[in-house]
Structures are given as C-alpha cells and as structure tokens.
Amino acid sequence: VGVTWVQPRQNSVEALCYGINHFDGVEFDLRLTTDGELVLHHDNTTKDDNYVELLSSNEMKPFADKFDDLLARKDFTNPWQEQGKTVCIELKSPHPSSGIGGGWRGGSKRVEYISSMVKMVDDAISQFELPEGTTVLYSFDKKFLPAVKAAGWQHPKARLMPTLREWGSGNLQRAIAAPSFIAHSLPRLMRKHQKWGAPMIPCTLDYLHGMNRHLTLGTSVSLTGKGLEKLTKARKGFPAFVWPVRVPHEKLILDAGLTALTDDSSPKITHLPGGSPRITRPASEPLFDGQHIPWHEMTNDSRKELLSAQRKRWQWGRSVDELLDSTNENQIPWEVPRIIGHRGAGKTNFK
C-alpha cells in the first residue's frame, strides 16, 4: 500500500467504517451521556479521569464520537444492510462510583438504566432494513438479560461471561473474573448461553489456547488434536466469538470453525507468519471454486454448496435446509467463521 496507514482511535466512526469494510464485521462499545446521547467509548473514564456517564455529549466530543454519527455513514450502514456483515454492540454499564444507574446498589435502577440504553439502540437502528442475524447486542452486566426483556429487544442478544466488573484495574478485573472462568468450562458455558437464547458465545482465547485451558472444571478443549475434536463435537456449530486473536493464531481459530476478534487491522498485513495469504473476510468474501467471491454476489446454489461443505467439515447441528432458511444475499448464518474488527480497527492505547 503506497499510502501510510495510521490506525484510527478505537471505537471512532473512522475505525468502524474501516473495520466493517476490511473485515466480516465489527464490535464496538456504547455508553450514555448525561443528555441522553449514545457515544462510542470503551473505558468508564475519559483520559481526564472523568466518568463518561457524568459528562454531556458536548463534553465527550474530544474523546468519543456519537452513535448517530456512525449511523449517518453510508460506508458503514450499506455493508451492514447489504453485504451480510456482522455488528456486535456492547453496552457498557456506568462505574458504580459515578452514582449513575443505582451506583453501588444497582438493583432495579440498574435494570432501568440498561433498558433505556437498549431502547435507544433499538430506535436508532429501526430506520434500517437490517437482515435477521446481522446484529447482536451484549453486555457483561448481570442485569443485562432482564433489561433486554423489559425493553422488548427483538434482535439476538448475549450476556458476556466471565463477568469483568466495570471497576478496578485490568488485573483486578481479571482476578475477580477468575472464579467464574474456572467454574465454567467452554461446553458448559455454551449450554448456558443457548439457554439464554444467545446466537453465539463470546469467549476468551484462554479457553482454547495455552495452559489456562486446563484450569476450568469440566471438559477441557483446545484448537488442535483431540481437544479440537471434543470442541467441534460439543459445539455442533454453536458459534464461539474468540478474543483477543493475534495474526499468528488466526488460521488456527478459523480452521477450528470459530470466529476471531482481531486488533490487527493494518492493510499492510497481507500474509500470515507461515507465508500464506491473510484472509480478512472469510465469511463475507469466502473462497469458493478457487476465488474469493463476495457473499452477496454468490448464486443461491453456490451458497448452498459452500454451506454444505462447511456443515460437514465442522459437524454443524442444523440441516442444510435450516441453514438456507437463515440465509440470503444479505445474511450469513451464525455458524460461518468470521473475522471481526475489535473496536473497529483494533484496540488503541489512546482513549
């Protein structure tokens, strides 16, 4: 690439427009300002150490773009509507010390707060003709599922586990999550998510790679050999969205039939460490008959052939006919492995 690529700020409109076109979709975070605007921001404070939920959208301007500004961009909404791209929206809860949403006590005020966010997202995206299965809403908050129910959300939703609470340093958050990480082996976690009606399970790479996978109680799974066989058999095609996946692990994740959330978005990364070409849109521009064809340009017969082969390879539970029922030129079944841009074009250290 002749032009120098500069990674845009995480969760910015520019990052998300880049990510949805460069990958099979994007994941991003939403918070709510004092004047009732949804803004694209991950951390619970700004770099000035102010809680996001105690600031107005105007005060947040230097730190975060508005969700409405993202939805005004055709280079974001067109791929979402017309090319089978996946959009994962994470709702962020206020830090308890902010006093917002019930503060440390939470309770029904927390449910009301999250429910109002869900309704706002619903209202904002209702103007678009979004195919079923292109959007999933999720949160780490324990009150998320009752809040979604109260809001009457009709799209897919998932509660993130293990619970990383919205307070404390990264290390403290991980330590708090450890007991629930150990108690929930991946197959058990999958069953829980299926019971909750989630279309997929978001999970950490620790479950699949490295020594941590032996810490969980229950079936230990992995990305190769017997562990992978166990995982494939247990999943029956139930999708796992894995993070964080760096380029060296990308092929392993996709070959296992899983979806990768990536921070590596530079167009200069054209090859994997082993020398094979990097494929950034395995779902929305799959390899078929020796060439990469955009999903929305494939014939129905081609899509059927591709899905039949993938179903056989990864032992998906749904029949070909069931898969085709949730398929059209703008919609890719959840089972199909994807690469998703984390916070758009990847995590950045500047907020």
Question: Which sequence ranges carry the predicted segments?
Answer:
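Phosphate-group recognition and catalysis centered on beta-loop-alpha active-site segments
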Residues: V1-K351
